[in-house]
Amino acid sequence: MSYDRAITVFSPDGHLFQVEYAQEAIKKGSTAVGVRGRDIVVLGVEKKSVAKLQDERTVRKICALDDNVCMAFAGLTADARIVINRARVECQSHRLTVEDSVTVEYITRYIASLKQRYTQSNGRRPFGISALIVGFDFDGTPRLYQTDPSGTYHAWKANAIGRGAKSVREFLEKNYTDEAIETDDLTIKLVIKALLEVVQSGGKNIELAVMRRDQPLKILNPEEIEEYVAEIEKEKEENEKKKQKKAS
């Protein structure tokens, strides 16, 4: 029997191959990074170059789900559009029903449940996306969650998905400290530094979004990102000079 064709059938050694293939699709997608700061959550995405005549504003990997929640994704954009639309409708339905916005975990659990249903339904295939979902709860606590095609979800302090996820995650494991997220600017710089591990052409190929408590999602413009990149480069040069002085 061909176990990689049937979505709902396990192989003898316990694999659901279609789910694993969906996870492979994510590894070919743009790198996305999420970091939870003290009073801020930051999402950064590697921007792929667009065609000369294409409007790059139509190519977004970061989007708002509600006033207090947004997400970034890696994988198939068409699949992500379906998940995003379903999640937005659920946010609106929740607001109409209980007259309050969703918590970040609630909408993450909804997205994870939607993905899980597509792993055991005939005539469907798993969603080929992984998502980083960030936002603020009622008490002002910043949250960061990650979901994958199997329907699992976990809370994180910082995480990465997409083709460069391994390198970026290793960088974050080494550099994520309380001091590194002490201020909003430091948190933003940490995300940019993490993305620069896999993005070669500097700030022009980075999409960055920040969310603060009781404030709408803000997408940073290229000039703002370039300013941060210039500061990071300057800090690197100063550190190199200090090392050279110590060595001499």
UniProtKB/Swiss-Prot annotation:
Transmembrane segments: none annotated. Its main location: cytoplasm. GO terms for biological process: ubiquitin-dependent protein catabolic process. The modification Phosphotyrosine is found at residue 153. PROSITE patterns: PROTEASOME_ALPHA_1, PROTEASOME_ALPHA_2. One of its GO terms (cellular component) is cytoplasm. The keyword Ribosomal protein does not apply. It is found in: Cytoplasm; Nucleus. The 26S proteasome consists of a 20S proteasome core and two 19S regulatory subunits. The 20S proteasome core is a barrel-shaped complex made of 28 subunits that are arranged in four stacked rings. The two outer rings are each formed by seven alpha subunits, and the two inner rings are formed by seven beta subunits. The proteolytic activity is exerted by three beta-subunits PSMB5, PSMB6 and PSMB7. PSMA7 interacts directly with the PSMG1-PSMG2 heterodimer which promotes 20S proteasome assembly. Interacts with HIF1A. Interacts with RAB7A. Interacts with PRKN. Interacts with ABL1 and ABL2. Component of the 20S core proteasome complex involved in the proteolytic degradation of most intracellular proteins. This complex plays numerous essential roles within the cell by associating with different regulatory particles. Associated with two 19S regulatory particles, forms the 26S proteasome and thus participates in the ATP-dependent degradation of ubiquitinated proteins. This is Proteasome subunit alpha type-7. It comes from Pongo abelii.
